[in-house]
Amino acid sequence: MLTVPGLCWLCRMPLALSHWGICSVCARAVRQRVSLCPQCGLPAGHPSLPCGRCLQKPPPWQRLVSVSDYTPPLSLLVHQLKFTRRSEIAAALARLLLQEVLMARRSTGLPLPDRIVSVPLWSRRHWRRGFNQSDLLCQPLAHWLGCAWDSQTITRVRATATQHHLSARLRKRNLKNAFRLELPVQGLHMVIVDDVVTTGSTVAEIAQLLLRNGAATVQVWCLCRTL
């Protein structure tokens, strides 16, 4: 997707603020239009009540906030973020996520985080790519919200296989002991930030690690939640 300074990257109309990248009309258009469970982020009957899945087996986090399903046009921008390290794309996408968070906070009284953490990459993958796309989202979010962020709060201590084609049992085994907590989180309201949440297994493993170490609450914020 071509990004042109001064024009909305999606509709090509002039921007009131050229550094925003996405106009307000397109920002509203990319938002999720189906009713989602506030806890797991999957389609549900009521947007303010946990779905049947979460009532039977709740995830280890209290709230999941996403902008959209992993579909164009947002998925194209997320792909560019992941493989180009363009700071203007990161800031524009972080702003979309911030808008969703603020709307969720107004409607449900969502607590503001004390600290946000990114989903870490395995060191070899981080070295090959040169950056962690989740870090690029965390930086502006922490600045705007006035909360702490440190890319080393959680580290990935071993490589893991791709999750998409694994069963739930194998996903859990694949991620077991893959992460380590490096900073204290006792009593803190924590947020895990990722670009895309697909099965939820990775953020679940990190959420459980935070809760075992005394975090007061855990939320998950992502650009795309695969439906």
Curated annotation (Swiss-Prot):
- Source organism's superkingdom? Bacteria
Q: Which Gene3D superfamilies match?
A: 3.40.50.2020
Pfam name, any one: Pribosyltran
**What SUPFAM superfamilies does this protein map onto?**
PRTase-like
Q: Which InterPro entries match?
A: ComF/GntX_DNA_util-trans, Competence_ComF, PRibTrfase_dom, PRTase-like
Function per UniProt: Could be involved in gluconate metabolism.
Q: Which NCBIfam families match?
A: comF, PRK11595.1
Q: Which family does it belong to?
A: Belongs to the ComF/GntX family.
Instruction: Identify this protein by name.
Output: DNA utilization protein YhgH
Source species, please? Salmonella typhi
Q: What is the lineage of its organism?
A: Bacteria, Pseudomonadati, Pseudomonadota, Gammaproteobacteria, Enterobacterales
Gene (name only): gntX
